[in-house]
Amino acid sequence: MLKKVSQHFWKKENQIGRINKMSSDELIKQTLESAKTIAMVGVSLVKKEISTNIRRRPSTIVMKYLQEFGYKVIPVNPFSVGEKVHGETIVGKLNDIKIPIDIVDVFRPSKEAPMIAEESVKIGAKVFWLQYGIQSDEAKKIVESKKIFYVSNKCIKQEYQRLFLKVSPVFPALKSS
C-alpha cells in the first residue's frame, strides 16, 4: 500500500507539475493506514535536566501512543544502544534494524535531517517524517529524489488523532479555558 501511495503521489505530481506533500491529508492518512513499522530516530530516555521520568519526553509519549494503535516502533539513539523503552530495545542507527521500515520519524534537530535522510534512503524507507519544528530543504531533496514521501513540521501522533480520531491536535495542557 505504501508503494501505491508513493506511486499515486508521483503520478499526481507529474500531472500538476509541482510537489506539495506536506499538506496532503489524503496521502498522510493513506500512509498511516498502511504503515506497520516505524523507526523513531532520537528517542530519549532522560530529559537534559537529568529527569528520570522517561514518560514525559515527547518522543517516548509519541512512541507509546503509536504502539497502542498497533504500530511496531523501533527506537533509534546512538547514545542509548541496548537500553529498553516501552518494551523495545534501542538501536544505534537505522542500518542496525533488520526488518523493513515503513516510516522514519525524526526527533532530531533540522541540521541532522540530511544525514538521517541519507540513511533512510539506504534502508529503503517509504516515508521520511520530521516532527514539529523540524524542516530541511536538503533532506527533502534527498528523499524526494528517491520518491520517498516527505512530511515535515508535523507531529505523527497529532496527525493520527486529527485524521482518524477527529481529536483536536492540541495537547490538553496547552488548551486555553
Pin down the residues of each PLM region.
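Structural/interface elements that position substrates and couple domains in central-metabolism enzymes
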Residues: 2-10, 15-102, 110-177
